[in-house]
Amino acid sequence: MGEEANDDKKPTTKFELERETELRFEVEASQSVQLELLAGMAEIFGTELTRNKKFTFDAGAKVAVFTWHGCSLQLSGRTEVAYVSKDTPMLLYLNTHTALEQMRRQAEKEEERGPRVMVVGPTDVGKSTVCRLLLNYAVRLGRRPTYVELDVGQGSVSIPGTMGALYIERPADVEEGFSIQAPLVYHFGSTTPGTNIKLYNKITSRLADVFNQRCEVNRRASVSGCVINTCGWVKGSGYQALVHAASAFEVDVVVVLDQERLYNELKRDLPHFVRTVLLPKSGGVVERSKDFRRECRDERIREYFYGFRGCFYPHAFNVKFSDVKIYKVGAPTIPDSCLPLGMSQEDNQLKLVPVTPGRDMVHHLLSVSTAEGTEENLSETSVAGFIVVTSVDLEHQVFTVLSPAPRPLPKNFLLIMDIRFMDLK
């Protein structure tokens, strides 16, 4: 490892990595860092690095560059931390991928379906990273796996507050992640499943149905299987939601990260044919504060409207109150004694409640449903995209929105989220 200064006053450090080691670094707030592979081969979460190409990572990025055979790397810019580690679970993760690939080959031979894998564990154990790794390794072998995102707090397939699926056709971009050109997305409306667990489980089942339908008509998708990312809520209703997801998707393999108790509970409660594997988390996994999570969510939403590093220009336009119908999924809970005869609180959770446009709608995100009419079940219909309300004019009965596409809105049924986005940058 050697340090030198370059022309533009950015500190530059070279790292020589031995085989099966990784360089871990975190980017300082309001800084950016450039990484370059000078010699050898290396990868980031399963995506191979191109030699002599500079990759840029923005403030808050937490990165691990792994090499199987040794390499030479250069970092330019201010990092909060940068060190090389020999202690990595990558070999175990690779073994998991190899076992899944054997299952795919067997599925091909025997005209069956490929492995459906669910990655579970508490918060901050690296679930999304393991998903990305398994998907990248599969797609590098010519597979076309489906990525299923059940983590409403993160929304890596779309934005936070949604659940969705993405057909993976190429490895994730080192800087931008997976290409999200045509995801299948459903509105959940909040960043925690506990706000409406009945809706959460219903959308999980819906995603499983749609995935099954795709597998019936697309042999390659069926053989490639899916990788399911889940929430970090693993107790009580959160645990029940994991069991429900495993059942809905008929998973074959459950990868449990870093929690023996959860591993034993799932081993006990899931059918005996489900292979449950306990894997360690990487030493590079960092605990994220509430503030950091909130910033990441905001950044994810900002990226939806403005593109990666601001490459898009969103549209602002007025929408008449009379042109749209806005709903919220789930009525407020009321005492059981006040419910109509034969109705339970659970029925209430799936109820569509009309929303009258008002000033309290400002900054809220709205999902634009693909539904043609309310006779379709709005909560189980996918969404075309999202808009954010920037102002409400009660006098003229219009509200102004920020939208990634120009007017008019493709459909007139909107679902309101609890999530707000303040466009301050």
From Swiss-Prot:
Pfam families (UniProt xref): Clp1, CLP1_N, CLP1_P
Record EC number: 2.7.1.78
Biological-process GO terms, alphabetical: cerebellar cortex development; global gene silencing by mRNA cleavage; mRNA 3'-end processing; RISC complex assembly; tRNA splicing, via endonucleolytic cleavage and ligation
Primary subcellular site in the record, as a coarse category: nucleus
Sites where the protein binds ATP: E22, K62, D124, V125, G126, K127, S128, T129
Cell compartments where the protein resides: Nucleus
Gene3D superfamilies membership: Clp1, DNA binding domain (2.60.120.1030), P-loop containing nucleotide triphosphate hydrolases (3.40.50.300), Pre-mRNA cleavage complex subunit Clp1, C-terminal domain (2.40.30.330)
Similarity comment: family membership: Belongs to the Clp1 family. Clp1 subfamily.
Free-text function comment from the UniProt entry: Polynucleotide kinase that can phosphorylate the 5'-hydroxyl groups of double-stranded RNA (dsRNA), single-stranded RNA (ssRNA), double-stranded DNA (dsDNA) and double-stranded DNA:RNA hybrids. dsRNA is phosphorylated more efficiently than dsDNA, and the RNA component of a DNA:RNA hybrid is phosphorylated more efficiently than the DNA component. Plays a key role in both tRNA splicing and mRNA 3'-end formation.
Protein name (Swiss-Prot/TrEMBL): Polyribonucleotide 5'-hydroxyl-kinase Clp1
Source species of the chain: Bos taurus (Bovine)
Gene transcribed to yield this protein: CLP1
